[in-house]
From Swiss-Prot:
One of its GO terms (molecular function) is RNA binding. Residues 46-127, 134-214, 375-453 form the RRM domain. The lineage of its organism: Eukaryota, Metazoa, Chordata, Craniata, Vertebrata. It is found in: Nucleus; Cytoplasm. It comes from Mus musculus (Mouse). This is CUGBP Elav-like family member 6. PANTHER family: RNA BINDING PROTEIN.
Length: 460
């Protein structure tokens, strides 16, 4: 073997480029922490997450790779606290923000390290990258104010990364804007210093400065709006006293029920079952849809009109459920005003459908992971912030959800931005596909499709 220019042979090792010593196995996290000669990091420095690194490389081995982009403040390889084993990822903080941006631009998914099948991941850590605590919504601006005016207003509070005035299609200002600062502290300082502090020229009230809504909050709000549009139903506050809890639940789900009932293949029997299904989700199966006093005529032997409330749960000409004249004894405690409820009565032809939903289902059974064939959906392009709870809330208006799961990376505990939802019937699954496939959340559009049957690829 030829000698190296310095007169000594290179060390032998399994890797052609990066043959370094492995990290110690003391457990927890071992780090390359700043010494006395290392300057403090900038106030707007970014903490980076580095993934897809060989498990044989420690901080000293990785340092030369990242130092070419700037001075490193801290580099920490993540290790299992119990076993001390390398997790294949690390956290990296540069002294300067620009260094982090350069490293991300040059390395993220651009280079594959020896022994790895996927390119290295270099991106802001979860707590840093979303910018949810740095992006502000600014309302009650003057119509004549542009981006430069807004920048001058917020410049004293720190470094502004983005500034966008919202405009109508004709180019006129909507009187509001988004401002994104370099750090959470700068954003909070701007809120404290400017919110309600002045009234801008041409504005009707004082300046509004607050944290902008997250993608998750916007998505859930759009879902609520869409549910109302599907049913062409506009709920209004009703002074119903003891009826409030019941009618609120009915109002919230009536629009989704109407949309589902009008879908292909759902007849009147299934519509009645769907009524009970949606009411059961709010623990209303064992109780009446409305207290007897609020839905009976003065004579007590027929349904009466409730001001401001449409006939409850009527679908495609199928009438609402008719109350019986006899109430359920011993159930006065369900109401604060002591009004006894009545049991819902069904035509005998629909008894099988109602029986299927007579028991209140739990929201997510732990043992049942999938629904029947044709009821299981794959959802792609979910927002990074979405968890299981948000996924359930998004798809619950379309039917009873058997299970919902967002897939998470085991090493980083970050969402992989896809998951699955299982319904208990194919109609709900098809309705969800029609409504949600292509639905935009943030900068992405959801892709919703049926999961392939397990035996789809098996030869006959």
């Amino acid at each position: 073997m030829a000698a190296a220019p310095g007169g000594s042979a290179p060390p032998a090792g399994p890797s052609p480029r990066l043959a370094f010593s492995t990290a110690d196995s003391g457990g927890g996290m071992s780090g390359l922490n700043p010494g006395p000669a290392v300057p403090m990091k900038d106030h707007d420095a970014i903490k980076l997450f580095v993934g897809q690194i060989p498990r044989g490389l420690d901080e000293q081995d990785l340092k030369p790779l990242f130092e070419e982009f700037g001075r490193i403040y801290e580099l920490t390889v993540l290790k299992d606290r119990l076993t001390g084993l390398h997790k294949g990822c690390a956290f990296l903080t540069y002294c300067a923000r620009d260094s982090a941006l350069k490293a991300q631009s040059a390395l993220h998914e651009q280079k594959t390290l020896p022994g790895m099948n996927r390119p290295i991941q270099v991106k802001p850590a979860a707590s840093e990258g979303r910018g949810e605590d740095r992006k502000l919504f600014v309302g009650m601006l003057g119509k004549q104010q542009g981006e430069e005016d807004v920048r001058r207003l917020f410049q004293p509070f720190g470094h502004i990364e983005e500034c966008t005035v919202l405009r109508s299609p004709d180019g006129t200002s909507k009187g509001c804007a988004f401002v994104k600062f370099g750090s959470q502290g700068e954003a909070q300082a701007a809120i404290q210093g400017l919110h309600g502090s002045r009234t801008m020229t041409g504005a009707s009230s004082s300046l509004v400065v607050k944290l902008a809504d997250t993608d998750r909050e916007r998505a859930l709000r759009r879902m609520q709006q869409m549910a109302g549009q599907l049913g062409a139903f506009h709920p209004a506050p009703l002074p119903l006293g003891a009826c409030g809890a019941y009618t609120t639940a009915i109002l919230q789900h009536q629009a989704a029920l109407l949309a589902a009932a009008q879908g292909p293949g759902l007849g009147q029997v299934a519509a009645v079952a769907a009524q009970m299904q949606h009411v059961a989700a709010f623990s209303l199966v064992a109780a009446p849809l409305l207290p007897a006093a609020a839905n009976t005529s003065p004579g007590g032997n027929g349904p009466g009109a409730l001001p401001g409330l449409p006939a409850p749960m009527g679908v495609n000409g199928f009438g609402s459920l008719t109350p019986q004249s006899n109430g359920q004894p011993g159930s006065d405690t369900l109401y604060n005003n002591g009004v006894s409820p009545y049991p819902a009565a069904y035509p005998s032809a629909y008894a099988p459908a109602s029986t299927a939903f007579s028991q209140q289902p739990s929201a997510l059974p732990q043992q049942q992971r999938e629904g029947p064939e044709g009821c299981n959906l794959f959802i792609y392009h979910l927002p990074q912030e979405f968890g299981d709870a948000e996924l359930i809330q998004t798809f619950l208006p379309f039917g009873a959800v058997v299970s919902a799961k967002v897939f998470v990376d085991r090493a980083t505990n970050q969402s992989k931005c896809f998951g699955f939802v299982s319904f208990d019937n194919p109609t709900s699954a098809q309705t969800a596909i029609q409504a949600m496939n292509g639905f935009q959340i943030g900068m992405k559009r959801l892709k919703v499709q049926l999961k392939r049957p397990k035996d789809a690829n098996r030869p006959y």
